[in-house]
Every structure is written in C-alpha cells, then in structure tokens.
Amino acid sequence: MRLISYLTPDGPRAGVVEDDQVHPITTGVMNVVCGEEIVRTGECVPVAGLQILSPLRPGKLIGIGLNFRDHAAETGKPVPELPLLFAKMPTAVTGPSGPVRLPAYTDKADFEGELAVVIGREARDVSSADALEHVFGYAVMNDVSARDAQLREPQWVRAKGADTFAPWGPWITAADEVPTPQALGIRTW
C-alpha cells in the first residue's frame, strides 16, 4: 500500500496509490499511520497532474548523521559508535516538488537522498531486534543542509532544520511491502 496526500480545489486529500491512480480515502494519512481503518470514497483520479503534498506533517522529525559508511568515509570521519542525532523542525517539511528556500545565513546548500522511516507505534527504548515492529512505512526524503552553518556550529538544528529543508514523498510505502529495507537503494538527480 502506498499512501499519498494531494491538493484539490476543496483542500488537502489523502489516498491510496495503485498503479498510476489515486483512490481517495475518507481520512488523513496520519490517521491511517495511527491505525485508523482505510475507507475509500469510490472515486479514482490519475496521479499525473496532481499537486502532491508532503505525505504527512510529522510533529517530530529526527535524522541520523553519518548513517552510511560511504558518507562517513567521504567526510573523513568514522561511523559513530552511537547514532549522531539531529532534528528538523515541522516547518522544514514540504512535498516532493515543493520549493527549497535558502535562509539568509547560508551561501552553501547541499542535499542528500535519505530513507524516511515512518514510525507507526509509540516507541521508547526499543531494542534493535524489535525496532522494525514499530515501523509503519518508508518514503524518500531530501535532507537539505546549510553546509557552511553545519561546519561552523556544533549542533545541526540551524543547518538542517530550516523551513523547507525536508522535501519528501511522493508517498509512504507500507512496511509490509518492503521486506528488507536495508537493501533499498537511494538515488538523487
């Protein structure tokens, strides 16, 4: 199952994507992530031509720095023993084709394609062995960074959390359709 949010003349709507069609549903994507049953409206609209929004607007967005061995190597840093966490503000979130607006404090923006992991069940102090049981699904995210601010400051909130610095989507793919997320490839262009 792939869940999408898109704009209609009546406002935002959510739907299930099958092939190149969207089947609108009666609730929002966040409600589905939280366990609400999907009820289709019976309509069907083509994906092509839709103004696609962020699949959902999370209240908390946590990133992991240096999360790929290759990326750590290219920066000359070792893979951290503990995850290097950073936050992106809710206002950083935008749709997959939304504009990225650079703040005045940066002259050097950069981007990295990332796998967004959507947590569907409340979790705290979860073991590695049980972590995937809490995952609702996956999406593609563009982790935009103000590299000059990132190199200048010890914390990364300003560098990575600026408005529009987290375009993602176009949809969330349910975890049961991704049996081995570690084997996924991510490509940007």
Functional labels for PLM-detected ranges:
Residues 61-62, 66-189:
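Glycine-enriched loop-and-adjacent helix/strand subsegments that border the catalytic/binding cleft
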